[in-house]
């Protein structure tokens, strides 16, 4: 299906077709890396790790079994129009989060650059990822934390 040019600038996330919605994903794979929350209230922090879902191809940032991911990885989260308010856990580079927050897509996003390789060329992919099955202690793999997480 042909996408309308610059559809993300003329439509809200709620107005997008399924094809447009899927096209927003830049393929960085960051949403497939494990995160955890520690603390409560004002002391609550969101920790990002370099621990990847076992289905994630660490080189490309793509799911190894996209069509069956929810059957294989039961904790895989489907981003939908219904869970838009929960997007605060997504990386600050994520198109879904950016558009939900009223921001623009970055120049390296494939919809802007026209290249599926622009994410890798812009150094957006997580380096030295490791699959969850190979990890014992998650604390060794923290790469960032979000103090403003709510």
Swiss-Prot record:
Alphabetical list of Pfam families matching this protein: CxxCxxCC
Domain of life: Bacteria
Stored InterPro entries: Puta_zinc/iron-chelating_dom, UCP006173
Record field: transmembrane: none
Protein family membership: Belongs to the UPF0260 family.
Protein name (database record): UPF0260 protein CGSHiEE_04300
């Amino acid at each position: 299906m042909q996408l309308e040019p610059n559809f993300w600038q003329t439509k809200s996330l709620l107005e997008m077709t399924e094809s447009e919605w899927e096209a927003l994903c830049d393929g960085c794979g960051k949403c497939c890396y494990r995160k955890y929350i520690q603390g409560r209230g004002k002391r609550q922090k969101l920790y990002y790790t370099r621990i990847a879902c076992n289905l994630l191809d660490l080189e490309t940032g793509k799911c190894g079994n996209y069509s069956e991911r929810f059957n294989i990885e039961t904790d895989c989260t489907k981003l939908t129009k219904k869970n838009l308010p929960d997007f605060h856990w997504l990386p600050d580079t994520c198109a879904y989060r950016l558009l939900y927050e009223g921001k623009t897509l970055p120049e390296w996003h494939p919809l802007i650059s026209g290249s599926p390789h622009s994410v890798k060329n812009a150094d957006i992919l997580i380096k030295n990822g490791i699959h969850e099955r190979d990890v014992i202690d998650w604390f060794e793999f923290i790469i960032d934390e979000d103090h403003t997480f709510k």
